[in-house]
Design a protein with these regions (language model features):
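Bacterial Sec-dependent N-terminal signal peptides
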Residues: 1-22
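Carbohydrate-active catalytic/glycan-binding domains of CAZyme proteins
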Residues: 20-485
């Protein structure tokens, strides 16, 4: 009865809860954004998970137009996520959790080289660094924890303490869990502002949120904002679900923004997109969401198509649980991808991040004569993928990781493969010359290839696949949006 009464109140007063409009900065799977203001420059990075080589760092001068500048290409420490990118003095720091601990890498130049990872041996996830006006460094982690660091920020310097309990949202709200995480710290006008996430990263559409607290000391007491939640999805009817994991940043002209991630309800398998919306500082020293402010448009994302004829692999490519820079080569003959394993479950994968609800990917493939196969997939994880791979004799058309249909390969060892993602329904086509196409499968449902079904907080990605003992060749990879803009 109480839950029904609360839902009635929400329905009656929904205009009071209507969220601000937002700017879509990066469509596709760009979760857990961390934004650094460095003079007139802005840098942003996101979770890397099992996609190697490592964290991709972007650069902007206006928060709207972003270009990739480097990968943090270091030793793999396990699935790495929720980073915090900072600059102290003339050194860049990237803190991140992986393998049950927290790590840091450093660089004098944002483009690298970056150091080897240092294990801080600090518990918790989602690290957030703060440097006090006196120069002391502290690392916050999930659950309201804080750990003092050494003066160089490369080791702990004391015990971890719990200093913040979070903001108590109404019990009737439909969330995944309390899950106090994503602490991001800002020093502003005599206060430390702690921006956190609560409610769970996925699960119900209304789960995630951004909340704020402030204190005169990193050890508290922390006072929760009267404007909480700063960002939240109040209804499953909203376009953006599970909005959370926010970082606040001062943009050009003194306008402040909160940058966060969210799922597109119409393309959940696409992952968590990066968005931002304006905030303002109040006369009583809090920041809050801004309503009815005209918003700028973000620039287009860099293209994903690749002819593989350059001197090095494009920025858009990653390996799955292994660093592609160690084995993928490009040149006048295209991409050479050494085979591994016997199927997409254990084979070699090279992936890119889709940006659209509907898109077409196409590639030209040359398969070795024997003991090898190659293909084009939409890949979430080993438990969830669809697409086609083939050797010189047969096609295997995957509806999912456990079910495939085998049919004769009448195209031979050289062919073109096309995947058409039509709002989470997949069509698979092949061609011998790139002009006349044969449809192998239609309307394979891929809408359930996402975290709420398979876990891991990943996204469905186009993937080149090479299996067996020899190298397969790929040319003319094309990615085309099917969305009318």
């Amino acid at each position: 009865m109480i839950r029904q009464f609360f839902r009635l109140l929400i329905a009656l007063f929904m205009p009071c809860f209507t969220a601000s409009a937002q700017v879509l900065l990066m469509p596709g799977d760009y979760p857990d954004p961390s934004v650094l203001k460095d003079g007139d420059d802005y840098y942003m990075t996101h979770s890397a998970f099992n996609y190697l080589p490592g964290f991709l760092i972007w650069h902007s001068r206006d928060l709207l137009h972003w270009e990739p500048v480097c990968r943090v290409d270091g030793a793999w420490t396990g699935s790495a996520w929720a980073p915090d990118l900072q600059k102290v003095g003339d050194t860049y720091y990237l803190y991140y959790p992986a393998g049950g601990t927290n790590w840091v890498v450093t660089a004098k130049d944002i483009h690298g080289p970056w150091s080897e990872p240092i294990d801080l041996k600090i518990r918790g996830i989602d690290p957030g660094l703060i440097v006090t006006p006196e120069g002391k460094r502290y690392l916050f982690t999930s659950g309201g924890l804080v750990t003092p660091l050494t003066d160089d920020g490369l080791a702990s310097a004391g015990e971890t303490e719990k200093v913040y309990e979070g903001w108590e949202y109404p019990q009737e709200w439909d969330t995944e869990c309390m899950c106090l995480e994503s602490p991001k710290l800002t020093w502003h006008d005599g206060y430390y502002y702690l921006t956190s996430a609560e409610g769970g990263t996925a699960g119900p559409a209304t789960s995630h949120m951004v909340v704020c607290a402030r204190s005169k000391s990193v050890y508290g007491p922390w006072e929760n904002s009267p404007y909480n939640p700063i960002v939240h999805t109040y209804s499953a009817d909203n376009k953006w679900w599970s909005k959370g994991h926010g970082t606040i940043v001062e943009g050009p002209g003194g306008q402040w923004w909160v940058v966060y991630h969210a799922y597109n309800k119409d393309a959940y398998s696409l992952g968590r997109n990066t968005l931002m919306e304006p905030i303002e500082w109040t006369s009583d020293g809090w920041y809050r969401s801004v309503k009815d402010m005209p918003l700028p448009e973000a620039g287009d994302m860099p293209g994903l198509s690749d002819d593989f004829t350059g001197s090095q692999l494009g920025w858009q490519w990653t390996g799955w649980k292994e660093n592609i820079s160690a084995w993928a080569t490009v040149g006048n003959d295209g991409l050479s991808l050494p085979g591994k394993g016997s199927s997409p479950l254990d084979g070699r994968l090279m992936l890119t991040t889709a940006n659209d609800e509907q898109y077409t990917v196409e590639v030209e493939v040359a398969i070795p004569e024997k003991d090898s196969e190659a293909g084009l997939l939409l890949f979430y994880c080993e438990k969830a993928f669809a697409g086609v791979n083939c050797d010189s004799k047969n096609f295997k058309v995957y509806q999912d990781a456990e079910h495939y249909t085998e049919m004769p390969n009448t195209m031979g060892r050289r062919l073109h493969i096309r995947l058409e993602n039509r709002c989470d329904y997949l069509d698979i086509l092949v061609s011998g010359d790139g002009n006349e196409w044969q449809t192998l499968a239609e309307k394979i449902r891929i809408a359930d290839f996402h975290h709420n079904r398979y876990g891991e907080f990943l996204a469905l990605r186009p993937a080149l696949y090479a299996g067996g003992t020899a190298s397969s060749q790929f040319k003319k990879f094309s990615y085309q949006s099917r969305v009318k803009h």
